[in-house]
């Protein structure tokens, strides 16, 4: 499925790395940034998420909640979050349903790995509407954070 700007964000429930259940529709009233990433402990993913960590005060100041999402297990994400001192939730899409729902799943990734999340960014506004959607085919690229921050600032 391809997500289109202006459509309601598909609802989902996933567990975070501390085993809390997170349901998207429960987040209405907050602007959200969903960041799908291929795999924990890889260089580009680490750089991307550490950049968010280092700038989390920006997101907090504009009342935007950030979630990282990958197909890694809860345990892998917990270790990754701890080792990188990440200060926002990481959600496990181990069964790949949400990555698929958001059009963010490689059928075949490098080294013949199947079912890895594509690096993607989605902004969902307070009403649950998709305001930004960027799905990257090249896992070594990062989302356009300049556009993301400008849009989020406008949604305050």
Region roles according to the model:
Residues 1-156:
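Chalcogenol-based redox active-site neighborhoods
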